[in-house]
UniProtKB/Swiss-Prot annotation:
Single GO term (MF): chitin binding
Signal peptide segment: none
Protein species of origin: Moringa oleifera
This protein's name: Chitin-binding protein 4
Keyword Glycoprotein tagged: yes
Function per UniProt: Chitin-binding protein. Has antifungal activity against C.krusei, C.albicans, C.tropicalis and C.parapsilosis. Has antinociceptive and anti-inflammatory activity in mice.
Highest classification ranks of the organism: Eukaryota, Viridiplantae, Streptophyta, Embryophyta, Tracheophyta
Record flagged with keyword Glycoprotein: yes
Superkingdom, natural source: Eukaryota
Keywords carried by this UniProt record: Chitin-binding, Glycoprotein
Post-translational modification: N-glycosylated.
GO BP terms, alphabetized: defense response to fungus
Length: 40
């Protein structure tokens, strides 16, 4: 899960958009939500 969250952070740094297709990434998206991240 931590690795998936790191991938989400990399995606956030590049596209500033966290693509949450997996439940683990959805949790990461909620955490990154404080950084104004739109969760698709």
């Amino acid at each position: 899960q931590q690795q998936q969250c790191r991938q989400g952070q990399q995606t956030h740094q590049r596209q500033r958009v966290c693509q949450a297709r997996r439940p683990a990434i959805q949790r990461c998206c909620q955490q990154l939500r404080n950084i104004q991240v739109q969760c698709r």
